[in-house]
Amino acid sequence: MARTTPLDRYRNVGIMAHIDAGKTTTTERILLYTGRTHRIGEVHDGSATMDWMEQEQERGITITSAATTCFWKGMDGQFEDHRVNIIDTPGHVDFTIEVERSLKVLDSACAVFCAVGGVEPQSETVWRQANKYNVPRIGFVNKMDRSGADFLRVCKQIKTRLGGNPVPMQIAIGAEESFEGVIDLISMKAIFWNEVDQGATYETRDIPIELQGLAKEQYEFMVESAAEANDELMEKYLEESKLSNHDIKKGIRLRAIKSEIIPMFCGSAFKNKGVQAVLDAMIMYMPSPLDVDAITGISDDKDETVVPRKADDNEPFAALAFKIATDPFVGNLTFFRVYSGVLEAGDFVYNSSKGKKERIGRMVQMHSNERDEIKEVRAGDIAAAIGLKDVTTGDTLCDMKEKIILERMEFPEPVIALAVEPKTKADQEKMGIALGKLAAEDPSFRVSTDEESGQTIIAGMGELHLDIIVDRMVREFDVECNVGAPQVSYREAITTMVEHQHKFVKQSGGRGQYGHVYLRIEPQEPGTGYEFVDEIKGGVIPKEYMPAVNKGVQEQMENGVLAGFPLVDIKVTVYDGSYHDVDSNEIAFKIAASKCLSEGVKMANPQLLEPMMAVEVLTPEDYMGDVMGDINRRRGIVSAMEDMPAGKQVKAEVPLAEMFGYSNDLRSITQGRANYSMEFAKYTAAPKNVADEIIEKLNK
């Protein structure tokens, strides 16, 4: 089969935003105008196409990133048919892992902002993630029909609060209830979408007199921004004091692809105004797979050579699995982005991350949760394979002969844990299967067993995250379970350097056990991790026992010394010891190292570390005092306060242990008018009285 759409007509775009900016509604309109849905789905009535899990439809939030393929020829049919692969990402901070995964495989993004709330707390988190992967983006200021809407104010906030460089490509005609349409600054015409056909058609008129001055001013700014793209455009602009429409588009595109500017658009997705122009902007200003740097990976040779993979059907096949989902009808779905080459159904691929061969049986292109079966995928495609057994998120799938590992994704450590137990014997087996599948889908969710109590412990990124996991066990896997109180994942660390030795000797008739080590145990900078150094001279401990010493140290680190929490950020140096020709073995050295570390750490002034959360609260000014008082009561430290259109924004660091049930408390002290976001910031030493209480409770 030949390629049906040339690569330069592909756009892989993520829709990213704050939780209530109207992101899913925007995506729904894109599907309507590109002809993929005939009935508009609305989030508020629970029928949105992209929100296909039951919990999403009930809670009105997007949890998983649904991927959809659609085609667009432009508002006036002015383009060749372009293939747009859209990924709708969740906006809630507990699901930032989903955002991170999808940004990794996209070429560009459309950032949706609320015209009233502007840059809200979650916008900053998502923006940072897009910066990390250097994703070019356009901005869409949505909800222009709402009270307090202001397009240019939001553009200013993007500059001051996100450090972006927004360039308005339109200005709004009216706002709030009188929002009618937009002025397209390139053509300098007013665009009004027809409400009769849900905005499928539009008419252009002259710019209203009262907006001509503002339009001229913004036009000049846009032209100057375009002229800065390269010397050729700058010379033209300086000579003629203007640029042609073609040159403006060229300059804006060049700078947007380099992430130097963010072309900005506005509208109301709910009122069917403006989304069509955003689709045009994706085609005009966002990159195709050919416009972004070739992805690089490490080849499967002993030198681990770095090799690029160009977006080209003739290159060897390489793809990245970025999401696993369990579908009630077909089982496991592995979403993957093809970077190079061609893959046909029935082909074998090599999973270079796991060192295993996989046969690709059926492949589907997803339209939200509807599946179109396909026979092949090519460079630039996003598709899903059915029934792959050993593939997990972040794995590389590649050609059997030309092996490559694309960079792995990094996932955050969970910060909150819950004990879950099945209600009946019948639920027990089902719960094991359910948790296994859910953990395969979501790398920020972990399952473990408490060795002492035998309880199953689930851990994740926040209360909502674990709520939804438990909810899914009931709905999708029919598992009833009891849930314990949330547990905080503490850590332990040392504050001073110690040197200590331990000799492990055991005689019990016949061959004995002998291991003897001297360890220097030192604290490291927070976040540095564990370092093991071998300074043995003259063979006082034979080399073959060193891995056992290292293992003994690491096993003891898992269990800490204060309250059984993992010990972090230490450097352990083996600098002396002794061995016995007959009685020494790996087990003896492992035990000696483990006991030496345990005793040494107790002398190194150990302390308990607690997870601190970066909390941002947006509250009406009337409740400011109560909100601040509540944060202080929770041992929080306020770091910044800022005036916002909707009131005041408070930024603080608060211990996670004090944040349980915060959403209900905040709702009651502000009568439901404040909202907040929270994400893990760092581990810091818990105050002595708090640490003593925790240690005493856990050591009972």
Swiss-Prot record:
It comes from the Bacteria. GO terms for cellular component: cytoplasm. GTP binds at residues 17-24, 88-92, 142-145. The keyword Cytoplasm applies. It is found in: Cytoplasm. The keyword Plastid does not apply. Belongs to the TRAFAC class translation factor GTPase superfamily. Classic translation factor GTPase family. EF-G/EF-2 subfamily. NCBIfam families: EF-G (TIGR00484), PRK12740.1-5 (NF009381), small_GTP (TIGR00231). Catalyzes the GTP-dependent ribosomal translocation step during translation elongation. During this step, the ribosome changes from the pre-translocational (PRE) to the post-translocational (POST) state as the newly formed A-site-bound peptidyl-tRNA and P-site-bound deacylated tRNA move to the P and E sites, respectively. Catalyzes the coordinated movement of the two tRNA molecules, the mRNA and conformational changes in the ribosome. This is Elongation factor G.
